[in-house]
Amino acid sequence: MERDGSRHKAFSRRMALLGGSQLSLAAVLMGRMYYLQVLESDQYKMLAEENRISMRLLAPPRGLVLDRFGQELASNRQNYRVVLIAEQTKGVAETLDRLARIIPIYPHQRSRVLREVKRKRPFVPINVVENLTWEQFARVNVQLPDLPGVQPDVGEGRFYPKGAETAHIVGYVSSVSEADLTGDPLLELPGFRIGKNGVEKVFDESLRGKAGNSRMEVNAYGRVIRELARQDGQPGNDVVLTVDTNLQEKIARRLADESAAAVVMDIHQGEILAMVSSPSFDPNAFNLGLSAKAWRTLVRHPRHPLVNKAIAGQYPPGSTFKMIVALAALEAGVAGPGHRVFCKGVIKLGNTKFHCWRNRYGGHGWVDMKQGIAQSCDIYFYDLARRLGVDRIGAMARRFGLGETFGIELTGEKAGLVPSKDWKLAVTGVPWQLGETLITGIGQAYLLATPLQLAVMTARLANGGMAVRPRLSRRPDGGKLSGDGAGSAVENGRDEDDDARKSDAAVQSIGVSAANLKIVTDAMSDVVNGARGTARKYKLDKELGAKMAGKTGTAQVRRITKAERKAGGKLSKETPWKERDHALFTAFAPVGAPRYATVVVVEHGGSGGYAARLTKDIMTEVLRSDPMARSALGPDSGERGRKREI
């Protein structure tokens, strides 16, 4: 009996301990539940909300690039695309295979996606394919239940309506590379593009705008159910250029078959009205995504379509440099306009012969400075160069803009080369030779200039020696256009012509005598309009009521052999293209009241006469359209926040 009682007491104690433990555990659980559901309810509601709500950045509309009259050179249009979120897929490669059965996915697109998956975080959307048709986009939407991690998206894509004709100016946008990442969250967005070349690159931050955001309700699989709220971003600023698109297009078509460059510039304000480099490329191809094969084709092209020859092509200026040598002689007092030299076609310095281009005709005979320029007598300029020395020639060249960059609103501008005695000694370790001075006097030897520099040189000759500098943007600080974009000459109480006069007043003189400038520019008029000028075949038609002044230039790319000289020089038709001389012509018009400077350089074009023929056609169009006389978008026109149609 006692044993049974002991057992009962032990059992009761165990039950009490077990019951107490259960009660304690229940109390702890109840307390924890109270803590979670009551005391911490707000915190967990917020976390639950965050799991249900997805915040997404919205790319703002990129600013437009417009010409001086408001024509769109870079715009935006609706872009149907597909993005992929790696962590939501059952396997990226498998998902791409399924997607490729619905819409076209090319090997280079697939390879790019697989590369980006490795370098990006798994929750960051990756652009798969863009610019789908509506039918393709609809097919993807129908198949979405079988495509986890795939998201159809509608955004804006960049479009270049003028294509290759303005490519070297406008540039292009392309995908963000790892080197481009700067911490701006916009750069992480799928399919986001940044400027990689031209105006698109130089003004990228201004064109880019500020991001907006969207609060989206999503389900457990991350799919969007609805948009709860949206805050639009700030559209990018528009950039208005000085270019006249109609003129640009006509010049581009005229040079389409050449490896060439042309620049048209207002001589007083420095506005670039046209800048053409041929051959060109389609900037839309870069926006869509260029294949490796297409890229190699462009890079290996013998005529270098990716290079803007107007600012990066460096050529011996040839006889277009003779005006600089003449001015250096006049300013230094070593020769006046009446200084005469007898040209028999060749001179000798030691054992070396220096020829004139008219050597096979017995030379030019007696020529003065005006005739020396008009007839492009090499012997005359050998004589001036010998009297001057290379350093005085170089000093005058630099006053006219050669040997420097201007900071124009483009990438890749080159400085060319104006040599000196010190330069040669520092670079080669060999002293300067007198023969090199003679060759410099006709624009050869080490001299190099870009077409843009030659345009600036010509503008400074024609505008009375004012140090005008080229510019490509009318509103470098961006801004919006108002209304429909039709600009007027007077906006916000400001007169555009008054602005131009103020701009002229700020330009400094290069310090060259007006009388000496007139001697040289009169000679340039005789080049085209004189009876014996080297470009007399290419004077402007009488119905234009204006005359053009200019200077031919033929730049050798290799030395003429004795056999070739004996045969009368190189015959371009019989010479391989790469060995033909470059053809140059620089001009201004109208004579008497100059406004425009034009330069044409044709690689391996044969002779300056060929470039003169092209320049005649271009200057004719310039004077007929007279872009500086027409109302353009004012420098401060418009307002921010302009709405765009896409």
Predicted regions and their residues:
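N-terminal secretory signal peptides
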Residues: 1-11, 21-27
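Beta-lactam-recognizing serine transpeptidase/beta-lactamase-like catalytic domain environment
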Residues: 2-5, 218-228, 268-319, 324-599, ...
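N-terminal export leaders
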Residues: 13-17
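Aromatic-capped interface at the extracytoplasmic side
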Residues: 33-55
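Short, small/polar residue-rich loop motifs at catalytic or cofactor-binding pockets
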Residues: 57-61, 211, 256-260
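Short beta->alpha transition motifs characteristic of CBS
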Residues: 60, 76-81, 274-280
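Small/polar-residue-rich segments within soluble enzyme cores
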Residues: 97-101, 116-236, 529, 547, ...
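Conserved, well-ordered alpha-helix/loop/beta-strand core segments that scaffold catalytic motifs
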Residues: 223-261
